[in-house]
């Protein structure tokens, strides 16, 4: 994992990430999936568009009955586990990633259905 200084240089430290509140624009990654300013920043600086694609794929499988999905990503020894839940400890899906160089130990993202698109966002953008 990266040091705090390295994360600062990448713009992925907790202070920088918490500065994303709301969003000025949406960025389409598929027909029904959008990123916010914060998740686009995370995908670019963390080189993890693969993560956004994985989230979009699972959201399509989960469906829209639950309009809110909490996504927890935890990285240990170069492997990641992505857990999709409803925010009340009910797990929708789990995916193991056998190798990743994602620079953070963990990250939590939210996904909200707006009746047309899933919007993937940082918690501070909710």
Each language-model region and where it sits:
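N-terminal "domain-start" segment
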Residues: 1-95
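Short, compact, well-ordered microdomains
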Residues: 86-126
